[in-house]
């Protein structure tokens, strides 16, 4: 809970981490915005979800016309938003008030703050303490590639990722507390933003139903109804738009229609996997390194929390920690499945700084990290230099990329 009782007097006090962590995050975003001019108040040119919400309010599924600068699916001569639809559901009440000019950046910023709060709650649920929570949570949000998407969270690609990130943390928190219905409902919301998180169904199932009997499953099965309704909405919407309940629209993007391999192919895997190890090149002006801004680069530079996760997992594995149980297998297995799906995609995120497709994995990496660590004070020594690396590279890289300095 966010409130604790004073040791004397029985009064309530606010757990300070719920204030300090969002404040630190906002300060960093303010600094980045002050160098780039990308404030939350600026107009959003990539407002695909707002346009879709307005179309729904007008009683139509397609957008009515082409917007050449947006990634639209073209099917039977009509133009559709090609991304999974859940963010448009969130924007419906805002579109009813503001039309297509919804406050997208503010909405995504709000989701980031909610995500920070749930990351703290998840840490408390797993470790049983708030001690060191601020270090792990700020490592997750500021020391990795999330910073790049958070600065322009209203853009269509980043709004979906911001919401998916938060819904993933919410799903993990409720699964850790055995609220299986809410856990799968939030995972269904995350799936409606970034479908690749379907890989984590086994993890949420294991975490949320640990030690549950078949009789308990039968008695509480109704709790899965909200998740089933959300998935049912996706299936019906897809069928109504593309005559295929499993098609969100990306297959009908011109770039994938023209591709002989399509959107997903095993033929992409080797090339994309190798890009996860791509280092900055030498030979820049005045001795500077040359950082790539298309697809991705070395994951340990952009998302060093993964390095901490891997080291801590190996530590837990060699110690044969019974307390970790199936987490030693299911967490890395589901992350590897997610990674394989990502590598089989035609692109690795296009123009960006870092590895934005890998960002979707980080809530689950965070869960694994705090699950494996051998008590407070045992694993934290590695996080400080890794946080320094990730924070400095991502902050400078984010500012440089948005300013087109690199």
Task: Give short role names for the model-derived ranges.
Residues 1-406:
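Membrane-proximal envelope and lipid/glycan-remodeling enzymes
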């Amino acid at each position: 809970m966010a409130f604790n009782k004073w040791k004397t007097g029985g009064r309530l006090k606010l757990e300070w981490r719920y204030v300090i962590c969002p404040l630190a995050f906002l300060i960093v975003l303010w600094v980045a915005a002050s160098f780039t001019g990308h404030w939350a108040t600026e107009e959003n040119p990539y407002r695909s979800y707002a346009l879709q919400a307005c179309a729904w309010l007008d009683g139509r599924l397609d957008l009515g016309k082409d917007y050449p600068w947006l990634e639209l699916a073209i099917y039977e001569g009509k133009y559709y938003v090609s991304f999974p639809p859940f963010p448009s559901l969130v924007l419906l009440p805002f579109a009813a008030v503001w039309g297509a000019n919804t406050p997208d950046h503010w909405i995504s910023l709000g989701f980031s703050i909610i995500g920070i709060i749930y990351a703290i709650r998840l840490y408390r649920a797993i470790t049983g303490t708030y001690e060191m929570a601020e270090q792990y949570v700020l490592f997750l949000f500021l020391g990795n590639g999330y910073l790049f998407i958070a600065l322009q969270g209203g853009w269509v690609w980043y709004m979906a990722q911001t919401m998916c990130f938060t819904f993933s943390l919410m799903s993990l928190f409720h699964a850790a507390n055995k609220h299986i219905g809410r856990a799968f409902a939030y995972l269904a919301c995350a799936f409606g933003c970034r479908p690749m998180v379907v890989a984590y169904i086994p993890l949420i199932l294991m975490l949320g139903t640990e030690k549950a009997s078949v009789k308990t499953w039968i008695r509480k099965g109704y709790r899965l109804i909200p998740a089933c309704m959300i998935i049912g909405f996706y299936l019906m919407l897809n069928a109504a738009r593309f005559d295929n309940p499993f098609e969100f629209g990306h297959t009908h993007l011109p770039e994938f229609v023209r591709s002989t391999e399509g959107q997903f192919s095993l033929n992409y895997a080797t090339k994309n996997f190798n890009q996860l190890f791509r280092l900055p090149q030498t030979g820049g002006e005045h001795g500077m390194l040359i950082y790539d801004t298309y697809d991705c680069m070395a994951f340990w530079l952009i998302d060093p929390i993964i390095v901490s996760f891997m080291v801590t997992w190996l530590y837990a594995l060699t110690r044969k920690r019974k307390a970790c149980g199936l987490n030693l297998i299911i967490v890395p297995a589901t992350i590897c499945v997610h990674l394989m799906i990502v590598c089989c995609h035609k692109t690795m995120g296009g123009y960006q700084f870092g590895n934005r497709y890998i960002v979707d994995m980080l809530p689950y990496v965070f869960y694994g990290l705090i699950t494996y660590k051998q008590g407070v004070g045992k694993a934290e020594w590695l996080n400080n230099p890794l946080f320094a690396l990730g924070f400095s590279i991502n902050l400078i890289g984010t500012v440089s990329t948005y300013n087109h300095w690199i």
